[in-house]
């Protein structure tokens, strides 16, 4: 075989070998991905009110090579069931856990007992009980902002009805207490109503108290209030916290006067990022408070508010 023919045969083989080496061993994003991390997410409820937060979590999981497993109490907002779920995940040696606490007092012992398991709470801060980190918002500022918004529609001495829809020690209650303090300081009458989805009982409260405004402090209660207000011309002005598609539609139609739209997509993303870095013993410098904005019908289509109301991945 001539040297020329030999070179014609060997050179392509060398080229293919080099190409294979580049594809198999050259630096690239997929070759620098960390090992897959399993992460359990213990929710407060199973409806669509955490959908945007869940999208944020799923986007972070995709970016950071994390596999999420969502766990939901059979009864919405059951701290007792959350304790059981948390203890089960810890005993099963879950590498990392996200928890949206329903009640700090009920969950405190289980959180403290989590030990070496990476545990990050979302919405309600439990670092004082031993959680590794918390992704939350300034609940006092949020509650005060809602109270201030409601004051615009309620004259001095007028009554504002606050919905207590999530009993227990949690971030949602912090919002309610902050709104109550501000409204009372500014001369408004405040009534607190324990919301139980009983529309008949609520209608009686409206008839007796005759509030000028109602404030809901989490998305589930605000969604139900918006539905109750449908077609009711005499319904009080409605304010609340939440930014689901249903709430945005109610705001657009005027059934909700103003909302505190929280960047829950960002909260979900940051929670997974924090837990992943801590579980992998990577550097994590903490996260700033999750932002929110008071949004009215006339401001809902500004570019900044669009990102809060209609987050996209």
Identify the function of each model-found stretch.
Residues 8-24:
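Hydrophobic membrane-insertion alpha-helices, especially the h-region
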Residues 38-56, 60, 69-79, 102-104:
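Extracytoplasmic "Venus flytrap"
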Residues 25-53, 132-133, 159-167:
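Short beta-strand segments enriched in small/hydrophobic residues
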Residues 104-141, 244-252:
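Flexible loop/hinge segments that line or gate small-molecule binding clefts
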Residues 49-64, 142-146, 170-189, 224, ...:
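Short, solvent-exposed amphipathic alpha-helices that sit
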Residues 266, 270-313:
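Hinge/cleft segment of the Venus flytrap/periplasmic-binding protein
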Residues 134-159, 243-247, 262-280:
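Hydrophobic alpha-helical segments within soluble ligand-binding/sensing domains
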């Amino acid at each position: 075989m001539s040297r020329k023919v030999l070179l014609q045969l060997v050179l392509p083989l060398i080229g293919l070998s080099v190409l294979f080496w580049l594809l198999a061993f050259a630096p690239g994003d997929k070759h620098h991905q960390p090992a897959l991390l399993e992460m359990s997410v213990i929710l407060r409820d199973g409806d669509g009110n955490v959908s945007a937060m869940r999208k944020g979590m799923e986007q972070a999981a995709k970016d950071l090579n994390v596999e999420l497993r969502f766990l939901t109490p059979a009864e919405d907002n059951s701290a007792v069931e959350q304790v059981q779920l948390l203890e089960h995940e810890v005993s099963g040696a879950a590498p990392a856990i996200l928890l949206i606490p329903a009640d700090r007092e009920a969950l405190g012992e289980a959180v403290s007992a989590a030990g070496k398991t990476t545990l990050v709470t979302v919405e309600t801060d439990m670092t004082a009980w031993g959680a590794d980190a918390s992704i939350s918002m300034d609940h006092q500022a949020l509650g005060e902002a809602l109270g201030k918004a409601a004051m615009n529609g309620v004259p001095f001495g007028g009554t504002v009805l606050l919905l207590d829809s999530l009993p227990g020690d949690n971030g949602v209650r912090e919002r309610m207490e902050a709104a109550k303090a501000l409204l009372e300081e500014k001369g408004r009458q405040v009534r607190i109503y324990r919301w139980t989805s009983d529309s008949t009982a609520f209608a009686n409260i409206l008839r007796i108290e005759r509030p000028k405004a109602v404030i809901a402090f989490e998305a589930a209660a605000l969604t139900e209030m918006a539905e109750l207000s449908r077609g009711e011309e005499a319904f009080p002005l409605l304010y609340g916290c939440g930014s689901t598609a249903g709430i945005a539609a109610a705001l657009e139609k005027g059934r909700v006067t103003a909302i505190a739209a929280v960047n829950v997509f960002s909260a979900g993303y940051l929670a997974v990022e924090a837990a992943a870095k801590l579980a992998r013993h990577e550097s994590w410098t903490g996260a700033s408070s999750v932002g929110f904005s008071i949004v009215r019908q006339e401001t809902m289509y500004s570019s900044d508010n669009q990102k809060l109301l209609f987050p996209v991945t």
